């Protein structure tokens, strides 16, 4: 007999996504397939922030293991430049007719039926050495630990409400940040880390030399991971196929509303007692949230060489 919590959870699953399950995938897409049926899949959601593509994709290409399948995913647009980047690096490219991010991601996973470990990256995420294998190691470490059922695993990111405080403490800049912007509150929305462009610039200024910061985290002697107590911004995550399937896939609002897939995935993790694991061994840079772009784009152009490889 189901407990009250089981009944409530089942009801939440039906109400939050039952109507949308038949629209989880789309048949209206263009797929340039170069997959190798790997059990590791990297999906890069891209199509709108071309000003960072050269550095972002060069970094991914340099650090992704050779036995991984990589697919650039565009929802609602088809970009010739992205097709050429995919061809250059031997990756697949998927473009869907509908501008629905969750549907595009689900379709990508469906087109890679052998993929068990699924990395989802946004187009404005900067990765470093051992990003993929260390994140995978953290997944296995936390899984073997047995303390938590894992929802998904993520890196420490600089511009991220769940992890920036840890980042600032690790590099010894927490007090300096709080003198400028107030308490570094762990939050996912209405705070400086989310909406203040100057805050994003500060966090990035402390992320250089980028690959030295990556190595600082790789050599971290602290506990392998911590858990996020709040909704996590899913610009860079690793999720197992079983957990993705249990969640009903990535879920859209039905009208293309941004971040709905994030909201529903975090809701699923909470309702199913699945932990959001943040690896203390992996650092990645997030360019910034929407309200921060006006300040971040000029900052990026002025400091472009620092975002490149080994700078």
Task: Identify the role of each PLM range.
Residues 58-67:
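Short, acidic, metal-binding catalytic loop of nucleotide-sugar glycosyltransferases
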Residues 57, 115, 129-141:
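Short alpha-helix within the catalytic core of nucleotide-sugar-dependent glycosyltransferases
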């Amino acid at each position: 007999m189901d407990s009250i919590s089981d009944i409530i959870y089942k009801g939440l699953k039906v109400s939050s996504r039952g109507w949308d399950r038949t629209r989880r995938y789309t048949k209206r897409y263009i797929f340039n397939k170069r997959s190798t049926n790997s059990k590791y899949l990297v999906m890069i959601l891209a199509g709108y922030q071309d000003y960072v593509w050269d550095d972002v994709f060069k970094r991914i290409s340099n650090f992704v293991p050779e036995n991984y399948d990589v697919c650039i995913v565009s929802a609602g647009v088809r970009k010739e430049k992205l097709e050429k980047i995919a061809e250059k690096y031997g990756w697949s490219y998927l473009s869907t007719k509908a501008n629905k991010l969750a549907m595009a991601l689900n379709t990508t996973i469906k087109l890679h039926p052998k993929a068990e470990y699924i990395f989802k990256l946004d187009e404005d995420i900067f990765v470093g050495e051992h990003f993929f294998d260390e994140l995978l190691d953290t997944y296995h470490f936390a899984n073997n630990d047995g303390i938590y059922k894992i929802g998904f695993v993520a890196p420490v990111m600089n511009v991220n409400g769940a992890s920036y405080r840890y980042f600032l403490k690790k590099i010894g800049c927490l007090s300096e940040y709080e003198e400028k912007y107030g308490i570094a509150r762990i939050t996912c929305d209405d705070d400086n880390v989310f909406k203040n462009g100057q805050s994003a610039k500060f966090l990035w200024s402390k992320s250089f030399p980028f690959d030295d910061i990556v190595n600082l985290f790789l050599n971290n002697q602290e506990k392998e991971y911590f858990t996020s107590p709040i909704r996590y911004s899913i610009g860079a995550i690793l999720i197992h196929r079983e957990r993705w399937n249990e969640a009903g896939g990535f879920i859209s609002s039905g009208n293309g509303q941004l971040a709905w897939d994030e909201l529903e995935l975090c809701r699923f993790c909470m309702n199913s007692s699945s932990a959001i694991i943040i690896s203390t061994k992996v650092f990645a840079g997030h360019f910034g949230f929407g309200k921060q772009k006006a300040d971040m784009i000029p900052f990026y152009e002025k400091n472009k060489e620092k975002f490149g490889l080994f700078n």
